[in-house]
Structures are given as structure tokens and as C-alpha cells.
């Protein structure tokens, strides 16, 4: 059984992923297509906040992820890995009440489910480094 927060993260991931192939469409509108009546009010509000936050901070998020890609560029990553990293990096930096371990564990699960056999390990390595060097100090106490 998926928790409401896991379902919310999946909705955000799916919207980010679909936006890669539907660039001319608004990211928030893509999210609305995904959010149906099975999502509760809080999950919808959280998903919308995540999408707005990712959109507003995307250049900084992408720049930060790029710093940890050895011999790779962000554009060369699979759309799955790139968008899992964007979602989780946003959550690590801006969602103060989510423990670092929860963010990374959920990102690994999404990457393993939708990515390649190496996606989970790859995402884990990048996010672990981002968390250690950039997550707010209070997140280490959750």
C-alpha cells in the first residue's frame, strides 16, 4: 500500500517526467491531469507546492545536481534519473519536515521502479552527497 506522501511524490515525479516530452505545456497543468479524485486534499496541495518550488528553483537545483555528476552532464542522464534527482533535491533543500533518509529512500525506490538496474545506486550516491553538503542543519536532527 502506498502512503499518501509516496503517491504525492510519484505524481510530482510523473509530472516532471512528462514535461520532458511535453515542453510546450505548463508543468502545473500536467500535474493537474495526474491528480485525480483518489488524491486527498493535502496530497494535492503538497504536490502543487512541490511543483511550484521545483519550477521556481530549477536552475539552482540543476546546477547543484550537475556539480556531483562525474563525467556526465545533466542532459545526458535518463529522464527518469534527472527528474528523480530534481524532486529529491528540492525536498532535501526546501521541505524542512521530511527526514533526509526518507527523501533518499523514496527517491531510490522511484528510480529502481522506473529507471535502469543502476538507477537506484546512482541516485543514492548523488543525493547522499547533496544532503551531506547542502541540506539544512535542522534536517539532520529529524
Swiss-Prot record:
Signal peptide annotation = none
Can you name this protein? Transcription antitermination protein NusB
Sequence intervals crossing the membrane: none
Any one GO molecular function term: RNA binding
**One Pfam family in the UniProt entry:** NusB
InterPro entries named in the record: NusB-like_sf, NusB_fam, NusB_RsmB_TIM44
Q: What does this protein do?
A: Involved in transcription antitermination. Required for transcription of ribosomal RNA (rRNA) genes. Binds specifically to the boxA antiterminator sequence of the ribosomal RNA (rrn) operons.
Q: Does the keyword Transcription apply?
A: yes
List the keywords (alphabetical). Answer: RNA-binding, Transcription, Transcription antitermination, Transcription regulation
Known Gene3D superfamilies for this protein? NusB-like
The UniProt gene name for this protein comes to: nusB
Q: Which residue windows are coiled coil? A: none
Kindly give the PANTHER family that the UniProt entry links to this protein.
ANTITERMINATION NUSB DOMAIN-CONTAINING PROTEIN (PTHR11078:SF3), N UTILIZATION SUBSTANCE PROTEIN B-RELATED (PTHR11078)
User: Which species is the source of this protein?
Assistant: Thermotoga petrophila (strain ATCC BAA-488 / DSM 13995 / JCM 10881 / RKU-1)
What's one GO-annotated cellular component?
A: cytosol
Q: Which family is this protein grouped under? A: Belongs to the NusB family.
Which BP terms in the Gene Ontology apply to this protein? DNA-templated transcription termination; transcription antitermination
